[in-house]
Structures are given as structure tokens and as C-alpha cells.
Curated annotation (Swiss-Prot):
Catalyzes the methylthiolation of an aspartic acid residue of ribosomal protein uS12. Residues 5-115 form the MTTase N-terminal domain. Its cofactor is [4Fe-4S] cluster. This is Ribosomal protein uS12 methylthiotransferase RimO. It comes from Chromobacterium violaceum (strain ATCC 12472 / DSM 30191 / JCM 1249 / CCUG 213 / NBRC 12614 / NCIMB 9131 / NCTC 9757 / MK). The keyword ATP-binding does not apply. It is found in: Cytoplasm. The gene is rimO. Coiled coil: none annotated. Keywords: 4Fe-4S, Cytoplasm, Iron, Iron-sulfur, Metal-binding, S-adenosyl-L-methionine, Transferase.
Length: 438
């Protein structure tokens, strides 16, 4: 009896990369390959890499090296793969190198070095494909690439311009996820609010209904499933205003992930980002008037070339007034190929780090203050896991997996992962909440 070929898989990077990995893993299983849990049990290994910032490049190169040392047969894909010379200069013995979102190229390389079985068992693959997330939540990628040319970013050079998935394809996948018991769908892309721009918002059909390829209509359709729908990577276009009433009405979660990046008009122009913080503050105020429960997550870059102390103080003033719920802050790091590398007046490393500390200290006060308001409230939570001490590790609508805070319920008797419960909040920290089941 012929041995079933086995493929090891290492997935690095962001949720978009994880979605690419899921597509490749689904194809591998559909063609009869087994997924090996360890290097020594695999006939070859696929490494899906990240290449966005220097630390990610280093992590990816280390992962490739480890796979080569442990197994010897490695196919590289993902964003670092778009810089093929970088991979081969360090690891010339890899079998093949492809870029991101390259399922067909990866499968071709796998076929070349590990021919597929003659009798694949397609029925071994669930309708929702192979998922890297827990069973109760899933990422739903609606597009690939980006039309923006932010000076600190090289995503368009790695993933190309915006290419929206057909609306019927996205909705069919969402329907399969909901039927399979997924309780939370996280909508991802490089620019979720640009969905359909490249197709001129082409009209599609789902279950006999006409549906426009556009973020608002997508949200309306996803809201029909009665599960959590969370929007990530939203660029602050004017039509984002249209989804706030959907959040107020409970069709999708009142949660917006909008990477504002900075508040100084000068710095934003250097970044080639929208440059009107007063307008942003006015919109945030309006959104909260329409939907008081709205939670806003954002990310910011400090120490960008040309950022002065005055620019940084303007940023601090912005976050104090905006009172965002969840915030990440990064010091600027040059990325090979980014046009920001050519900008004058780089900020010294010690100044970058000092500004990051000051920024996070201000935001910690804001986060703690906003979380204190939750004490005494009853929230619906989704259980991610029960830890070894019997505590339920949960999330509310305000918490995206892996990046936001958590809700802990210490007496988790009868609670199960992947289920919803009502919890009264009794305590908080700067980032997390503690509750008791109701």
C-alpha cells in the first residue's frame, strides 16, 4: 500500500496570511495530502512568510532555516516570497519560492516535489475548508491587494492592487461558515472599505437576490446570519458612515478597526494618508452619537521621518480627545522598498522609544477609564477557552481575538468554548475585564 504523502506547514504573519494558508491547506487536503504535525513526519514543508517589517523578515528567514535543518525540503510562499532573491540569498537550497496569495503556484511546486496521491478523498475536507482558527470564529477575506500608496508600506508591491472577491463567492463562504457553527466572522482585507471599488461596485447575486459588491451591502447580508460580524482594516472613507446604523441596529458588531496612523497633518501627508484630524474627530463624535456602544480600535506610528515634538504633541492631543478604546503603537521602522526611507530628518531611535512610552502611558489611562465604565454592566461574551485553572477566557463584542483585551470568568462551571454567555462585569484593569456569569 502506497504511503500517503504528508506536508508540514508553518504559517506566519497577519490574518490575511492566515487566510492564504487556509486556502493552501484546504487544497492539500482536497487532493489527498495529509498535514503533518511535525517536521520529522513530513515529506516536505511549506512556510508561509511575512515580509512587512524587518523583524518579520528575520522571523521568516529563521523559520525557513529551522524547517531546512529539521526537514530539508522546503517550499516558501507569502510576502517575503515576493522578494525571492532575499530568500535564496540566505537559503539557496529551498525547493521553490512564490509570492503571497499564490495557491496555484504553491500546489504546482508541491506536485513537482511530492506528487499527489492517485485516489484523493475529497470528502475528508469539510465544507468550510481547513481552518487555522478555533472552530467558533473564522477570518473572511474579501479582497486582495491595495490601491493606496502609503509611503511606509510595501503591501502593493507584494500583493498587488486591489482585487475584490465576487460578492456571491464571499457570501457563499460566509453562509458555509455560519452553517458549520462558526459564531464570529472577522472580515479582513488590506482595505475593507474599498471593497468593490475595482469592480465599480458590480452587481452580483446571492440566493436569488441582487447584491452590490460594496462594503455596506456586504455587511447587510452578513448580518442576516445572526452571528458576530467584526470589521477589520477599515480606511476612513465617507461611506464608512453608512455601516454605523447597521451596528446600532445589531446587524454587525459595533466595532471598527481603523488604522489612523497619526494626527499631525504634516506627518500624514508625508505618509500619504488622509490628513484632516479635525474631520476625523467630528466623525468619531457623530458615530458615537448614532451608536453609543461603538468600540474603535486603531494603530499609530511614532517616530516617522520628519516627526517633530510639536507633531507628536498633536498626536497626543488627538488621542486624548478621541478616547479610542483599543490602540496599538509602533515606532517607525524602515522597510526595504518603502518610499519613506528616502524622507529626510529621521528620528533618533531613543527619541522614537521615548515617544512610544509616552504615547502608551496616555492611552493606558484612557483605556482604563473606558473599561471602568463597563463595571456593573452585563455583557454577552464568547468563550475562547477554559484554562488549566478552570477560568473561562472570553471576549465581548469589544474584543477581537489575539489583539484586544479579554474577559475572565473565574468560576466557569458549565461554560463551554465556542458558546455565548451573559456575564456581569465586576472588575477591570487597563486592558482586561473580570466578570461573573448571570
Amino acid at each position: 500500500m502506497n504511503k500517503t504523502p504528508r506536508v508540514g506547514f508553518v504559517s506566519l504573519g497577519c490574518p490575511k496570511a492566515a487566510s492564504d494558508s487556509e486556502q493552501i491547506l484546504t487544497r492539500l487536503r482536497a487532493e489527498g495530502y495529509e498535514i503533518a504535525p511535525s517536521y520529522d513526519g513530513a515529506d516536505l514543508v511549506v512556510v508561509n512568510t511575512c515580509g512587512f517589517i524587518d523583524s518579520a523578515v528575520e522571523e521568516s528567514l529563521d523559520a525557513i532555516g529551522e524547517a531546512l535543518n529539521e526537514n530539508g525540503k522546503v517550499i516558501v510562499t507569502g510576502c517575503l516570497g515576493a522578494k525571492g532573491d532575499v530568500v535564496r540569498d540566505v537559503h539557496p537550497s529551498v525547493l521553490a519560492v512564490t509570492g503571497p496569495h499564490a495557491t496555484e503556484e504553491v500546489m504546482s511546486a508541491v506536485h513537482t516535489h511530492l506528487p499527489k496521491p492517485h485516489d484523493p478523498f475529497v470528502d475528508l475536507v469539510p465544507d468550510i475548508g481547513v481552518r487555522l482558527t478555533p472552530k467558533h470564529y473564522a477570518y473572511l477575506k474579501i479582497s486582495e491587494g491595495c490601491n493606496h500608496r502609503c509611503t511606509f508600506c510595501i503591501i502593493p508591491s507584494m500583493r498587488g492592487d486591489l482585487e475584490s472577491r465576487p460578492i456571491h463567492d464571499v457570501l457563499r463562504e460566509a453562509e458555509s461558515l455560519a452553517k458549520a457553527g462558526v459564531k464570529e466572522i472577522l472580515v479582513i482585507s488590506q482595505d475593507t472599505s474599498a471593497y468593490g471599488v475595482d469592480t465599480k461596485y458590480k452587481l452580483g447575486f446571492h440566493n436569488g437576490r441582487p447584491v452590490k459588491t460594496r462594503m455596506t451591502e456586504l455587511c447587510e447580508e452578513l448580518g442576516r446570519h445572526g452571528i458576530w460580524v467584526r470589521l477589520h482594516y477599515v480606511y476612513p472613507y465617507p461611506h464608512v458612515d453608512e455601516v454605523i446604523p447597521l451596528m446600532r441596529d445589531g446587524k454587525i458588531l459595533p466595532y471598527l478597526d481603523i488604522p489612523f496612523q497619526h494626527a499631525s497633518q504634516k506627518v500624514l501627508k508625508l505618509m500619504k494618508r488622509p490628513a484632516n484630524s479635525d474631520n476625523v474627530l467630528a466623525r468619531i463624535k457623530k458615530w458615537r452619537e448614532i451608536c453609543p456602544e461603538l468600540v474603535i480600535r486603531s494603530t499609530f506610528i511614532v517616530g516617522f521621518p520628519g516627526e517633530t515634538e510639536e507633531d507628536f504633541e498633536e498626536l497626543l492631543a488627538f488621542i486624548r480627545e478621541a478616547e479610542l478604546d483599543r490602540v496599538g503603537c509602533f515606532t517607525y521602522s524602515p522597510v526595504e522598498g518603502a518610499t519613506a526611507n528616502e524622507l529626510p530628518n529621521p528620528v533618533p531611535e531613543d527619541v522614537k522609544e521615548a515617544r512610544k512610552e509616552r504615547f502608551m502611558a496616555v492611552q493606558a489611562e484612557i483605556s482604563a477609564r473606558r473599561l471602568e465604565r463597563r463595571v456593573g454592566q452585563t455583557l454577552q461574551v464568547l468563550v475562547d477557552e477554559i484554562d488549566d485553572e478552570g477560568t473561562a477566557v472570553c471576549r465581548s463584542y469589544a474584543d477581537a481575538p489575539e489583539i484586544d483585551g479579554l474577559v475572565f470568568v473565574e468560576d466557569a462551571a458549565g461554560m463551554q468554548p465556542g458558546e455565548f454567555y451573559q456575564v456581569e462585569i465586576v472588575d477591570c484593569s487597563e486592558h482586561d475585564l473580570w466578570g461573573e456569569r448571570r
